[in-house]
Amino acid sequence: MYSVLVQETPMALLQLLKEHSSLFAFSLLILLLKFIYKDKSRKRRVKLPPSPPKLPVIGNLHQLGNKPHLSLRCLAEKYGPIIYLQLGEIPTVVVSSARLAKEVLKTHDLALSSRPQIFSAKHLFYNCTDVVFSPYGAYWRHIRKICILELLSAKRVQSFSHVREEEVARLVRRVAEFYPGTTNLTKMLGLYANDVLCRVAFGRGFSEGGDYDRHGFQKMLEEYQELLGGFSIGDFFPSMEFIHSLTGMKSRLQETFRRFDELFDQMVTDHLSPKREKEEHKDLVDVLLDIQKKESTEMPLTMDNVKAIILDMFAAGTDTTFITLDWGMTELLMNRKVLERAQAEVRGVVGERRVVLESDLPQLDYMKAVIKEIFRLHPPAPVLVPRESMEDVTIDGYDILAKTRIFVNAWAIGRDPESWEDPEAFEPERFIGSTIDFKGQDFELIPFGAGRRGCPAVTFGTATIELALAQLLHTFDWELPLDTAAKDLDMTEVFGITMHRIANLIVVARPRFP
């Protein structure tokens, strides 16, 4: 669910070069000599995937552009669905078709199940001891098992149904308050996503203020997203990692980590306090602390492990819910017939009841098709979190050497004309009668990844999205402001750890019920 290619790569790189030109010149000279020596000393001939021309030292970094998912699709259209890039010091393979995604995520899943050590992730996620960024091994298998069996099981997801229902009701009240004026729906959806995950993870919301909010939680999240999704030269030139101390990147990471760690320490202290009121339903911190207390295995969880897992759950979950709902409502307002059909279905199932129940959701086939179409065109992470090969493998006749970084362009796969008819059109009808799903078995549609590294929170995320979308469709009639035409909505993407719309969605939401 994260994407960690660079944001505004060329500009960031040029700014760094400008500020530290002498140091970079010396460092790049060393790298150039190193590359020349490496090329001359290579003894074994290998058959690498097709590759565009590269520059000395930086390799193909300059070809990523401001929106790497688009640049990589353009390269795939020219060189094929599997390409080789030299991103600084990092050998990289990018796949952009469902057939080859299956090779990476299923056929060679185990051999390609590790993670590269991302500079920002090491500093934010307790030295990569979370589920997403931890390298493959016994520890990762242990914490993933905890996530699947304890934190995100079907029973656990169901136990949080009251949280989803209460937060959806709060979302509806917030939106209704602005009628007959306009509503910044993007902001409302962001509050909903944050509050659901905060209550599930920590036992309380944040948008209403309180003790935790004095830490500036929302600002911390924004800084975290910027740091994790921004350009980090150490990720492509590991031998030059020392430069982060000079550019200020390392100090920013350390300060953001310190603030999160302080907040998590307070949360854990609150949960362990004997004066804390017993909650009817345990939150995720409760569950992890119980596991930590009971575990007698050779691999007990440390408190830092607990905090890393919680940050993972929260960071991944909020963005997925928010982005999907924001893109979804935007697409529906641009496609009025789809909106009307989805509303008619929901209202036909729910009737005159004001509240959509989770038991209504299995009957909403067309709305589920709408959500699949949102995931196809706007996967939260356009490029899946990179994998790293643990051994040599062969894909499509090409040699993929150990320690190669592997990117899967989920955005390009969702728009591949080899897999989809009229791929740029928003047409949920394509999923009616289709067995294609987004849970990792159909490689044409992989917004949550697949295989061992697939997102374990699919069930939770889907429930959070479906209930909110159904209730919004049921409760309100939706229009754009009089001065805004659907064709003029800004669909510009902001590429980072996830892919947001650059503009807020401003709407008029007319309540159906008094």
Swiss-Prot record:
Name of the coding gene: CYP71AP13
InterPro entries in the cross-refs: Cyt_P450 (IPR001128), Cyt_P450_CS (IPR017972), Cyt_P450_E_grp-I (IPR002401), Cyt_P450_sf (IPR036396)
Name the UniProt record assigns to this protein: Cytochrome P450 71AP13
Pfam families in the record: p450
Main localization category: membrane
Source species: Prunus mume (Japanese apricot)
Family, similarity comment: Belongs to the cytochrome P450 family.
A GO CC annotation given for this chain: membrane
Tissue occurrence: Expressed in fruit kernel, seedlings, leaves and stems.
Glycosylation-annotated residues: 127, 184
GO MF assignments: heme binding; iron ion binding; monooxygenase activity; oxidoreductase activity, acting on paired donors, with incorporation or reduction of molecular oxygen
Binding residues for heme: 455
